[in-house]
Amino acid sequence: MKIVPLVERPELVDQVAAWGFAEWGHLNPGQTLHSRTARIRETMDADRVPIVLVALDDAGLLVGTASLLFDDLEGDTRNPWLASVFVPAGQRGKGTASALVVAVEDAARRLGYPILYLFTTSAARLYGRLGWRALERRDYRGEHIQVMDKAL
């Protein structure tokens, strides 16, 4: 597996946007698939936030994605955020999500951020195994979320 910035594989933007919209679109009222795709395409970068990373298998096929973002949790002033970690069901259990998380942590560290935040509806155990600390639970747009952080 190889992890690269999405800016190096722009042909994958549509799939990354579709995964994100299908998984978390309900948490972003007013956002459409088109607007999500356009936002990703317009802000792709490898050296400043936002950074979208993609995981590729040995054949070069897309098997996951994760992002480093500002302002991922509306109303929360902490930054930056590990966000949009997604691996399709058929690719799970191979360490892809963990590798993506570590790659985003490395990107944040490289950019000089001392701490990283995330929120999750269902993967707190995964993040806990990777050294993330639970900060708070709250309701967010109809979902129960866990906010976590990790010192880099």
Task: Report the location of each language-model feature.
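Conserved acetyl-CoA pyrophosphate-binding loop and the N-cap/start of the following alpha-helix
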Residues: Q91-A103
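Conserved active-site alpha-helix within GNAT-family acetyltransferase domains
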Residues: R110, P114, T121-H144
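Short hydrophobic/aromatic beta-strand or adjacent loop that forms the aromatic wall/cage
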Residues: P50, E143-V147
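Conserved beta-strand in the GNAT
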Residues: V52-V54, L61-D71, N79-W81, F86
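A short beta-loop-alpha structural element at the N-terminal edge
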Residues: M1-V16
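Conserved hydrophobic beta-strand within the GNAT/NAT acetyltransferase core sheet
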Residues: V85, L116-L118
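Active-site rim helix/loop that mediates acceptor-substrate recognition in acyltransferases
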Residues: G25-L56, S67
